[in-house]
Amino acid sequence: MAKALPIMFQGTHSDAGKSVIATAFCRMFAQDGWKTAPFKSQNMSLNSYVTPDGNEIGRAQGIQAEAAGVAARAEMNPILIKPSREHESQIVVLGKPYGNMQAFAYRNEFFHQGLAVIRQSLETLMNEYDRIVIEGAGSPAEVNLNDRELVNMRIARLANAPVVLIGDIERGGVFASLVGTLSLLEPEDRKRVIGVIINKFRGDVALLKPGLDWFEQHTGVPVLGVVPYLPDLAIDAEDSLSLERFASSVGGEEAIDVAVIRCPKIANFTDIDPLLAEPDCRVRLVTHGDELGAPDVIVLPGSKNTIEDLIYMKKRGLASRIVSLVNEGKARVVGLCGGYQMLGAVIRDPYGVETPLPEVKGLGLLPIETTLERTKITIRTEGMLTWAGERFSVQGYEIHMGRSAPLPGYAPLIEADGRHEGAKHSDERVLGTYMHDLFHNDAFRTAFFNNIRRQKGIAPSGVRLFRSLKEKAFDRLAAHVRQHVAVERIEQMMRQFGCRDHS
């Protein structure tokens, strides 16, 4: 595996900030003129990304490719694990569904096949790019799993990559977690760790210096940076833990109240990220009918198990409350992918794709019926959306196992590639579509919320370009990390490491 110089970021635990730091390095290397590819051998996430050629990968690697200024491709995340029901996940290999497997079977039956796919993907990228930014998962010190792990030190050895270990100081105990992780590594793996980064720091770094000095003396591993917490970073999150940033959103008395229904199998929740671009929107997550109130907008996001989440909504009083609010003319509803299916008359599952139940009654707010099928659709979508007497050019992507058919009274929401996509209620207060990234389309999003603003007596807003905000966020993140991390030292260590003999 020659040509590219790799660097790998591993964490002491999940959500330590590996994805964000890796994104920063993708951007920095691209800014410095290097053709850069992100790589994560195996990703477990319900947030996915469709590549230009219709393959499904983890959302983080798609965003990292954007940061690097290159087209995302399946080799950047050759294995994607999407939890679908208790102890079972859908396995996506090189962008296409492989099948559903339980955790024990995956670990014992898929290991060698998975490793072969990972090796080939990594070789392809190493031969075509200058820099490879590799992201691990969880912790490299999971001693009960390390004999068959496919995402941390085994990948570092495969790529002959130096490793930077990331610790999250926000959670507390950062030195214990860093030292503990290092102590649990095999000696040859510990030699790969060229340094650590302490992430999400708040306060005066001078107060941290005695701890940094102690750590370096105790472990012999250098601290390569202390990265202060960076608020309001408009970059898609991957981990559902990141949804909590919406729970604390606040707004004034005139704010537009947006309630996002948070079900257990919520997927592709990055669909709601552009709402952060609307300064007068208060976005809150709702899990029970009693919490719903009377919002201006209700968003039903995607789901990895639509039927189970629909049953969850019914049991918690959400379904009946949503229907009542619509019938009373008090709320607008937008359903995305699985949320779109829920808005229809019925969801049928003749092949047991999601549950043993043959069918479940939907909310009945859109004239469609859905049948879940074994074949997954993953495509990029472009078309014209018609709403409130206006037509908007929109683009996004679709990832779904079901197909929805129109019933009497059906009106399409989008005309895409010669077909009708999505649906809308006769009064246009209920919209549904399979197309993710609906709110990423700036003109439509602005018109949608300006309609609400006018009804609430709020001045209309100008168009805010979410893609521009994302590009600025990439640059802001890169500048932030350059300021607080010894980037040049890391690059020097990468070159030195590549010259070593690790056979």
UniProtKB/Swiss-Prot annotation:
Domain GATase cobBQ-type: 255-444
Keywords, comma-separated and alphabetical: Cobalamin biosynthesis, Glutamine amidotransferase
GO biological process, one term: cobalamin biosynthetic process
Catalytic machinery residues: 337 (nucleophile), 436
Entry-linked Pfam families: CbiA, GATase_3
UniProt GO molecular function: ABC-type vitamin B12 transporter activity; catalytic activity
InterPro entries tied to this protein: Class_I_gatase-like, CobQ/CobB/MinD/ParA_Nub-bd_dom, CobQ_GATase1, CobQ_N, CobQ_synth, GATase_3, P-loop_NTPase
Pathway the protein takes part in: Cofactor biosynthesis; adenosylcobalamin biosynthesis
Role noted for this protein: Catalyzes amidations at positions B, D, E, and G on adenosylcobyrinic A,C-diamide. NH(2) groups are provided by glutamine, and one molecule of ATP is hydrogenolyzed for each amidation.
Homology family: Belongs to the CobB/CobQ family. CobQ subfamily.
Protein name: Cobyric acid synthase
Organism ancestry: Bacteria, Bacillati, Bacillota, Bacilli, Bacillales
